[in-house]
Amino acid sequence: MNTQARLTSTQWKARFKGYVQVTKPGIIFGNLISVAGGFLLAAKGDVDLVLMLASLVGLSLVVASGCAINNCIDRDIDAKMQRTCKRVTVTGEIPLSHVLLFGIALGVLGFGILALFTNALALLFAAIGYVVYVGIYSLYMKRNSVYGTLVGSFSGAVPPVVGYCSVTGQMDMGAVILLLMFSLWQMPHSYAIAIFRFNDYAAAKIPVLPVAEGMAKAKHHIVLYIAVFALVSTMLPLAGYTGTAFMAVTCATSLWWLTMALKGYRQDVDMPRWARQVFGFSIITITALSVTMALDFQAVSQTPLFTLVR
């Protein structure tokens, strides 16, 4: 009896771990930081804790839903990749229908929280990001187009905008800058992953840039996107949304990241190692900027491009 109970307990723990894994906790955590950064930038020190908690929890559940459903969609290509071949949607440890229902439930709960506590614009951006990620990127673009990363970058840039618009209820220049900034950041971040996971993507026949058009072109794009990202990031302080601390941090991190990327042109470069370094510093960069803009906000007069409130 005790042996059976222990076995059941072990199976339950494994099942629980599987459900957690399909939500991709690392992605959720990264998005939490950017949502908080966008929210606190817009709040400018006047923080509504209930609204902030609702924005963080609601958006996290939406992201978790998208990731769970993405696992269902990607099960065939995940089976061909060393990094993902042991996911529960591939092994069958959890039935696919259960993961799908779990993802739908998370989405309903997440969107429900955003609808109840935030505003129509924040909810709209969350919905658009979700549709782009699940419906356009996962179902079609990732498998069929070299531009899949570009399309996916939009959904990856939505979380800080949701946080920002939860406070303002309007689409102003600050929100536009955040959307551009985080979209641009996604590109070198994703291309770096595609380089050090090249064999996986090639085996699954996913047409990411390094696989479809070669390493040389991917390196050019990484450098170009980092350079443009650096310029766009300075728009937050130049437009008066943040102060000198943010300007200093964005200049320092962007310059270091760009210098690191340029090392990819060396003849003796170890490509996988270099790509991992570019990827790793991309996380440091965006985390540093999210934290800094949350602390170094400025009280500026916001001119809305359009307003959509409850």
Swiss-Prot record:
Highest taxon listed in the record's lineage: Bacteria
Record field: transmembrane: 25-45, 49-69, 98-118, 121-141, 145-165, 176-196, 222-242, 245-265, 277-297
Enzyme Commission code(s) on record: 2.5.1.141
Gene Ontology terms: biological process: heme O biosynthetic process
Membrane disposition: Multi-pass membrane protein
Pathway: Porphyrin-containing compound metabolism; heme O biosynthesis; heme O from protoheme: step 1/1
GO MF annotations, alphabetized: protoheme IX farnesyltransferase activity
Similarity section: Belongs to the UbiA prenyltransferase family. Protoheme IX farnesyltransferase subfamily.
Role summary: Converts heme B (protoheme IX) to heme O by substitution of the vinyl group on carbon 2 of heme B porphyrin ring with a hydroxyethyl farnesyl side group.
PANTHER family: PROTOHEME IX FARNESYLTRANSFERASE, MITOCHONDRIAL (PTHR43448:SF2)
Record-linked NCBIfam families: cyoE_ctaB, PRK04375.1-1
Record's protein name: Protoheme IX farnesyltransferase 2
The species this protein was found in: Shewanella sp. (strain ANA-3)
Taxon lineage: Bacteria, Pseudomonadati, Pseudomonadota, Gammaproteobacteria, Alteromonadales
Underlying gene: cyoE2
